[in-house]
Amino acid sequence: MKDELFNAVRVTPSTKIRFKCTGCAECCRHVKESVPVNSLDVFYLTKYLRDTGLDICCTDEFLAQFATIALLDDCGYFVYFLKSVGEDDSCIFLNENRCSVQPAKPMACRLYPFMVDTNGSGGFRYLYSREREHHFCGPVVETRSWMKKYFQQEARAFMQADFADTVPIARLLRSIPEHGKNEALFHFHRLRYSEYNLDRPFLEQFLQNQKQLLIILGRMAEKTT
């Protein structure tokens, strides 16, 4: 999906395009370190796999088996991507040209061929990619309708909160000296990805964890001043 990002075109909610999923699974191949899984994705993927019989009980187990870590900024801020397998770097969940976690697939996959970013003022901006031209045929799709179907309220609230805290968290991480960085990143992972009860609603846990993370990092940063 890296190519999709570089070839993205800005669209408005009223923009209409032609799109049809052909079942070719090309969007699931050549995706090494290209399919991000945010806290929301990790929660629901773990829950889905657990509830469908996989011997997995927590998000840490999911991340160890199915995700790879990537540094986003030299302050230590990191993210996760789904692992890829095989010579063609297929998504680890691609099975016989079908997604094996379809009901819980990541936000990036649900929204394809569209992408969502925040606009800096509490709203969203939308993009789409024409990287795979053969997808852009068939019925007309309106951005607004697509987002209403695939970018629902919980995902919107999560993304707004997540993006709002990204810069403050990165700033705090940057202010913590090297001798405290490992502890800071431990809390970063624990509260953003690990400390979740799969049987409780996600969003309230995420918001509580983010608040706690900012408090902890703030206290650690204050010790250096």
Show where each model-derived region lies.
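Short loop/turn segments that flank or connect secondary-structure elements
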Residues: 1-225
